[in-house]
């Protein structure tokens, strides 16, 4: 059984939801980023969603854009990101790891080369943020060739065909976006039709649904789970803690530990 399937089976058996933090690899630099990721896992993260630094991210709001810039300014390349992932996988052989990145970074490695490298490291899933489902077939084929699970976003304005396509082609988990726009911890509004989308995705046998965008507080995790999703992803709120503590690494780790514990507690 693949890692995400194993995780969701374990969570279901314990009647828990999942909490999945997102951070950008190498933010604010390679060494501190490893400490940060270890802190997330050690304090209750059920899985990791990790981003590759990119100069022009499509869906990212100002907080995660700044994280990308910090990582790039620290000299982080795709090769360095893969090195960091190797280190994380070596320390945590069981935790599911999903990547979120833009297509240009994959093309720079070639499709086959990128997914082969992911498989060598032990990455579980890849979500390509700027490739719509209609153009995704080459990515799906390359991912499956190397045993990587392709993940797709279900946007809040998805029609029936989009919901069906996302459900059929996603593996590992399904990413449900809370609202239109870019990532943000400040904008915590959620689209009014999320309940309906959850029902539709489940009707089409989608993989377990993780809700992201604007998830910054434990109460929002509870609300997401009450709607029927399997867990919640928190990116901007996690990265804001890094941003607020760039000059105090120990406080950064302590604040992240408290944040993850509180968010995970909301899933119990």
Swiss-Prot record:
Keywords linked to the UniProt accession: Amino-acid biosynthesis, Aromatic amino acid biosynthesis, Lyase, Tryptophan biosynthesis
Keyword Protein biosynthesis: no
GO cellular component: cytosol
Active site annotation, chain numbering: 49, 60
EC number(s) reported in the record: 4.2.1.20
Example of a GO MF term: tryptophan synthase activity
A Pfam cross-reference name: Trp_syntA
Catalytic activity: (1S,2R)-1-C-(indol-3-yl)glycerol 3-phosphate + L-serine = D-glyceraldehyde 3-phosphate + L-tryptophan + H2O
UniProt pathway: Amino-acid biosynthesis; L-tryptophan biosynthesis; L-tryptophan from chorismate: step 5/5
Cross-referenced PROSITE patterns: TRP_SYNTHASE_ALPHA
Function: The alpha subunit is responsible for the aldol cleavage of indoleglycerol phosphate to indole and glyceraldehyde 3-phosphate.
Family: Belongs to the TrpA family.
Known partners and oligomeric status: Tetramer of two alpha and two beta chains.
NCBIfam families the UniProt entry points to: trpA (TIGR00262)
Listed name of the protein: Tryptophan synthase alpha chain
Gene behind this protein: trpA
């Amino acid at each position: 059984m693949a890692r995400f399937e194993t995780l969701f089976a374990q969570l279901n058996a314990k009647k828990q939801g999942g909490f999945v933090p997102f951070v950008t690899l190498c933010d604010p630099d390679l060494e501190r980023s490893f400490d940060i990721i270890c802190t997330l896992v050690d304090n209750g993260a059920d899985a990791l969603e990790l981003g590759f630094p990119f100069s022009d991210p499509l869906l990212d709001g100002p907080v995660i854009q700044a994280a990308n810039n910090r990582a790039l300014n620290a000299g982080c390349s795709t090769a360095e990101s893969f090195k960091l992932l190797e280190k994380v996988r070596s320390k945590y052989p069981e935790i599911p790891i999903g990547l979120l990145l833009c297509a240009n970074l994959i093309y720079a490695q070639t499709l086959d080369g990128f997914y082969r490298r992911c498989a060598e490291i032990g990455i579980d899933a890849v979500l390509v943020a700027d490739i719509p489902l209609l153009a995704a077939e080459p990515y799906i084929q390359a991912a499956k060739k190397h045993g990587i699970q392709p993940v797709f976003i279900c946007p809040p304005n998805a029609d029936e065909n989009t919901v069906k396509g996302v459900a059929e082609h996603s593996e590992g988990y399904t990413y449900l976006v809370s609202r239109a726009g870019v990532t943000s911890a400040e904008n915590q509004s959620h689209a009014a039709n999320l309940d309906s989308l959850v029902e539709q995705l489940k009707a089409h046998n989608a993989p377990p649904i993780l809700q992201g965008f604007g998830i910054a507080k434990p109460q929002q995790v509870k609300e997401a789970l009450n709607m029927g999703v399997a867990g919640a992803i928190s990116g901007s709120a996690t990265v804001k803690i890094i941003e607020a503590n760039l000059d105090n690494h120990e406080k950064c780790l302590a604040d992240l530990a408290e944040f993850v514990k509180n968010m995970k507690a909301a899933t119990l």
